[in-house]
């Protein structure tokens, strides 16, 4: 299967009029044309969740501008409709179909062999691969470690909380790395990690966050997509600090979200589709680390000047040690308790 979306068309012509004299030309001409790049995105949540799903959605206008792509998307897609959504887009002739999230991996591996002329990308999944299938995996646990360093530096009570959606391996790995980051700067701290079982239930997230706050937690971190808004709301109402996830969420609560763990789904998806459009696609997983534009922390905001500087220094030092190899952030796929 061709890896570049390039079509060579041979146009045969005869009896073509040339100029006013009515002269005739016969022969053949070869043209290289670029077919329309058509990209479909399947989202498990809302395209305006101010986080994980929205960041993926924001890749579409960039692809339209950069490649002249035609794009389409489905949002709030139930798990039991993942496969049909993939098949529908492939049947409609989309060149690229993207599943936003680890949970699309199994479906992609099932569907991809049936549509060899369609490329399938699954984000946040290091396991999927095939001739026309690729997982795009940010080493998000490294950025989560930095978020933990920031949280541990800010916390006065020594109690920090992390609230996540589903207990997927890549989510667990980030939660565990966050915990390690907190303990690196505040040994003996209490780090409470909780999984909601949902990425959508804002009220459940808010109630969970309130319970942590009532127990003395003074910094909250989330990996909960739309439900994470409930975590931020609870922190804002209680007057404690919060760390966003996915994109810079300071705008959600400017006096509460002092930084965010950046996992730039937009940049990662654009990069993945660009490889297909430009013919450099390889059917094996790609990992994006702290040395890429995909991962990091958002600028430190809202904190008092001296504390802000302290956090920036601690985070910069931790990042340098990761990049140099002095600190290795492990991938821990199961909760350690």
PLM regions and their residue ranges:
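C-terminal motif of bacterial Sec signal peptides marking the signal peptidase cleavage site
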Residues: 15-19
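Bacterial N-terminal signal peptides that target proteins for export
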Residues: 1-6
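A residue-level marker of the well-folded mature domains of exported/periplasmic proteins
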Residues: 27-337
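Bacterial signal peptide processing site
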Residues: 21-24
């Amino acid at each position: 299967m061709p890896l570049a979306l390039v079509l060579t068309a041979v146009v045969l012509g005869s009896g073509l009029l040339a100029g006013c004299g009515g002269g005739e030309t016969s022969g053949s001409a070869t043209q290289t044309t670029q077919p329309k790049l058509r990209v479909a995105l399947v989202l498990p949540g809302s395209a305006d969740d101010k986080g994980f799903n929205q960041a993926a959605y924001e890749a579409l206008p960039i692809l339209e501008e950069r490649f002249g792509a035609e794009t389409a998307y489905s949002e709030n897609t139930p798990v039991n409709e993942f496969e049909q959504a993939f098949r529908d887009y492939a049947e409609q002739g989309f060149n690229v179909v993207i599943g936003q999230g680890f949970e699309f991996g199994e479906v992609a591996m099932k569907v991809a062999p049936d549509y060899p002329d369609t490329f399938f990308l699954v984000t946040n999944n290091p396991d999927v691969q095939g001739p026309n299938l690729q997982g795009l995996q940010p080493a998000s646990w490294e950025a989560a470690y930095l978020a933990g360093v920031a949280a541990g530096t800010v916390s006065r009570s020594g109690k920090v909380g992390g609230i996540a959606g589903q207990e997927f391996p890549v989510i667990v790995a980030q939660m565990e790395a966050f915990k390690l980051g907190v303990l690196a700067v505040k040994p003996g701290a209490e780090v409470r990690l909780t999984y909601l079982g949902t990425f959508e239930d804002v009220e459940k997230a808010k109630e969970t966050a309130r319970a942590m706050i009532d127990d003395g937690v003074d910094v909250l971190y989330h990996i909960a997509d739309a439900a994470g808004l409930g975590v931020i709301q609870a922190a804002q109402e209680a007057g404690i600090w919060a760390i966003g996830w996915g994109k810079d969420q300071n705008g959600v609560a400017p006096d509460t979200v002092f930084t965010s763990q950046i996992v730039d789904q937009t940049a990662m998806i654009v990069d993945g589709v660009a490889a297909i459009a430009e013919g450099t696609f390889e059917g094996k997983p790609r990992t994006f680390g702290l040395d890429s534009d995909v991962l990091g922390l958002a600028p430190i905001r809202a904190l008092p000047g001296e504390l802000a500087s302290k956090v920036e220094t601690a985070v910069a030092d931790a990042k340098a040690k990761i990049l140099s190899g002095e600190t290795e952030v492990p991938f821990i796929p199961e909760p350690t308790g």
